[in-house]
């Protein structure tokens, strides 16, 4: 059996929810629920509200997606690094 086809879409994180879940607005205006992929959790990649992300959506359920990539924008906020004091 072949692996199911996935749709790759870009969106912007609107809200960070508990349990590593997010509310994302896609480029076409549709709002979907999403979760961070295992690779992103393993590498401690932080996703904040306002970040531009790439999602994978199943063709069977277009209301939930998996965040695969957080785009690096020059104006996106950066979380403080561990061990550094804020000034």
Swiss-Prot record:
Functional note: One of the essential components for the initiation of protein synthesis. Stabilizes the binding of IF-2 and IF-3 on the 30S subunit to which N-formylmethionyl-tRNA(fMet) subsequently binds. Helps modulate mRNA selection, yielding the 30S pre-initiation complex (PIC). Upon addition of the 50S ribosomal subunit IF-1, IF-2 and IF-3 are released leaving the mature 70S translation initiation complex.
InterPro entries documented for this protein: NA-bd_OB-fold, RNA-binding_domain_S1_IF1, TIF_IF1
Localization of this protein: Cytoplasm
Protein name as it appears in the record: Translation initiation factor IF-1 2
UniProt cross-references to Pfam families, sorted A to Z: eIF-1a (PF01176)
Cited HAMAP family: IF_1
Species for this entry: Burkholderia vietnamiensis (strain G4 / LMG 22486)
Domain S1-like: 1-72
Keywords: Cytoplasm, Initiation factor, Protein biosynthesis, RNA-binding, rRNA-binding
